[in-house]
Amino acid sequence: MGRTVQDELEQIRAKGLFRSTRLIQGRQSARVTMEGRQLLLLCSNNYLGLAEHPALIAASMAAAEQFGSSSGASRLVSGSMEPHEALETAVAAFKRTESALAFNSGYAANTGIIQALVGRGDVIFCDRLNHASIIDGALLSGARLVRYPHNDAVALAGLMEKQRGTGRCLIVSDGVFSMDGDLAPLAELAELRRRHDALLMVDDAHGCGVLGEQGRGSAELLGVLSHIDIHVGTFGKALGSFGAYAALSRELRDLLVNRARSFIFSTSLPPAVLAVSTAALELVQAAEGDELRKRLRDNTSLFRGLLRDAGFFLGEGNTQIVPILTGGAEETMDFSRQLLEEGMFVQGIRPPTVPAGACRLRCTVMATHSPQDLTWAAERITHIGRRLGVV
């Protein structure tokens, strides 16, 4: 007899890796209510606070009234609706590409795109710390997967010289790495793309709306917007909506429409969600978007500075994702529980999300946090961190 579900759950618990969801009441604000207590929220990806913006809520209600509550089927079955076309036109203009295609989630985008682009006889060069959806898409594609050391363009160059092969070649990287908050070396990746006649795909889920002069992401910040073949991003983080996109050439879009299984075999996003995403893109490019990004930068600088001054190791990044390296799973979750008792919700991150021994508190800063919120949070994190011997 094989292992039971109960056996598997007991093994997960024994390793200190059991997970469960927590119920919060109300919106994804800077402060939330959980089990009757008000908490400072320091683990949401709602970086600009748009998830509760009146303009986005109004766009949702208007679209539902005009177009109904559902898209009905896959777009290849029952057709695209006007909100699909409006959003994809807005995404292409935002990312300065010929075309764009909406997906139901970032996971669906990455798995579908990679499987559509490469297969047996092709090769994928993939950063070791890329998001799980990229790894899963690469494994499902059947292409040869070559994983290079994190952000090491020199090592990647050597691997490409030896293992490029003659098939289609795809370089894929996060733009901002979700667990470390550091940036990919996109200029170097773009040069390797040119040198080896490769496609370059960048998942900028955590840079979209936040980085660059108009929030176009890490590629805009680093000056390589036009050197990336497939820009992937999400509407569900800084843009305060749901779903994802690929911004790319018309030819590549046509290929995805015909080959990306996660697009072909899924009922598409509903009109209300599409309208929210379109409204968010307009907002982040306006003066209000500039102000929100500045507020987020200022908040991030304040919070990171306070924690660094206290002696915490925060890795190499300088974005709104602030990892506090803690070590083991049990210590990390104890730290998280004590912070919850103090009045803040900070998520502990354990394997398989991060490697064993690299557990962390993943703090995320929002534009809607006040300086007083972040100063208080840093003080309490420091107090508990010293008590636990983390710093």
UniProtKB/Swiss-Prot annotation:
EC number(s) per UniProt? 2.3.1.47
Main EC class the enzyme belongs to: transferase
Example GO molecular function: pyridoxal phosphate binding
Pathway listed for it is: Cofactor biosynthesis; biotin biosynthesis
GO biological process: any one?
biotin biosynthetic process
**Which residues are recorded as binding substrate?**
19, 131, 353
Cofactor(s) recorded for this entry are: pyridoxal 5'-phosphate
Q: Name one Pfam family in it.
A: Aminotran_1_2
What keywords are annotated for this sequence in UniProt? Biotin biosynthesis, Pyridoxal phosphate, Transferase
Give the catalytic activity: 6-carboxyhexanoyl-[ACP] + L-alanine + H(+) = (8S)-8-amino-7-oxononanoate + holo-[ACP] + CO2
- PTM annotation (N6-(pyridoxal phosphate)lysine): residues: 237
- Give residues annotated as binding pyridoxal 5'-phosphate: 106-107, 178, 206, 234
Q: Which domain of life is it from?
A: Bacteria
Q: Which HAMAP family does its entry note?
A: BioF_aminotrans_2
What the protein does comes down to: Catalyzes the decarboxylative condensation of pimeloyl-[acyl-carrier protein] and L-alanine to produce 8-amino-7-oxononanoate (AON), [acyl-carrier protein], and carbon dioxide.
Q: Which family does it belong to?
A: Belongs to the class-II pyridoxal-phosphate-dependent aminotransferase family. BioF subfamily.
State the NCBIfam families in the record: bioF
The record's PANTHER family line, in alphabetical order, gives: 8-AMINO-7-OXONONANOATE SYNTHASE, CLASS II AMINOTRANSFERASE/8-AMINO-7-OXONONANOATE SYNTHASE
Q: How does it assemble?
A: Homodimer.
Descriptive protein name: 8-amino-7-oxononanoate synthase
| Biological source species | Pelobacter propionicus (strain DSM 2379 / NBRC 103807 / OttBd1)
The coding gene here is bioF
